[in-house]
Curated annotation (Swiss-Prot):
Protein family: Belongs to the UMP kinase family.
Protein location: Cytoplasm
Taxonomic lineage: Bacteria, Pseudomonadati, Pseudomonadota, Alphaproteobacteria, Magnetococcales
Matching Pfam families: AA_kinase
Residue numbers binding ATP: K12, L13, S14, G15, G55, R59, T162, Y168, D171
Enzyme Commission code: 2.7.4.22
Name recorded for this polypeptide: Uridylate kinase
Length: 241
């Protein structure tokens, strides 16, 4: 697809990104930077939603590796995403951008329960919608949650914000000769075992015809550049014959 034609976009952001240069928690300077990037994106007349991770506070899979039951560990990870979502909502609101948090785990005194119809209504009215608590179920990644929410809100595009400017055949940080892909098909991602998103997330997007863009959130202006159709991301979609 022509990415520049996308009008409803879901942005998946890892919790680790919120740490900035810190070893833990939320870096105020990165939060301010993220707000600026989001505001620049919605200035393009984009309807924007986010799915945010919680790895800067707690990773369920790490807790499980340390002997904690996986279900309980994943539930703790879901709660970490709620903290991040509320922090981002507050930062956006303080900067004059309306934002709503919707959670997969009901906590009515903290956030709205997830509802795809109300989420789409909020977005049409110019509000940023932040989805937290993953899918609400253990054993599912936030990548899968992002793909699921993208399907539910009928997004035109799913953007995954990462540390690098696209998808490579190996880690470009460790391998300076790593090859960057401009475009890929869902099938190529799966068969090449490229560590972009988990298989469930890729399959959901493929079955529902939602292109995926992978870009660097740490490059200022990259988000808006991608939304304008500039080659700042690797685009994953089915190729037209």
């Amino acid at each position: 697809m022509d990415v520049a034609r996308a009008k409803r976009v879901l942005l998946k952001l890892s919790g680790e990104a919120l740490m900035g240069e810190q070893a833990y928690g939320i870096a105020p300077e990165f939060l301010s930077y993220l707000v600026e990037e989001v505001q620049s994106a919605i200035a393009l007349d984009i309807e924007l939603a986010l799915v945010i991770g919680g790895g800067n506070i707690f990773r369920g899979i790490s807790g499980s590796a340390n002997g904690m039951g996986r279900t309980r560990a994943d539930q703790m990870g879901m709660l970490a995403t709620v903290i991040n979502g509320l922090a981002l909502q507050s930062a956006l609101m303080l900067s004059g951008t309306e934002a709503v948090v919707q959670t997969a785990l009901e906590m009515p005194r903290v956030a709205e329960p997830f509802d795809h119809d109300s989420a789409k209504s909020h977005m049409k009215q110019g509000r940023v919608v932040i989805f937290v608590a993953g899918t609400g179920n253990p054993f599912f990644t936030t990548d899968t949650a992002a793909a699921l929410r993208a399907c539910e809100i009928e997004a035109d595009l799913l953007l995954k914000a990462t540390k690098v400017d696209g998808v490579y055949d190996s880690d470009p940080v460790k391998n300076p000769k790593a090859k960057r892909f401009e475009t890929l098909t869902y099938h190529e991602v799966l068969t090449k075992n490229l560590k972009v998103m988990d298989m469930t997330a890729i399959t959901l997007c493929r079955e529902n015809h939602i292109p995926i863009g992978v870009f660097s959130i740490f490059e200022r202006g990259a988000l808006t550049a991608v939304l304008r159709g500039e080659p700042k991301a690797t685009i994953i979609e089915e190729r037209k014959e």
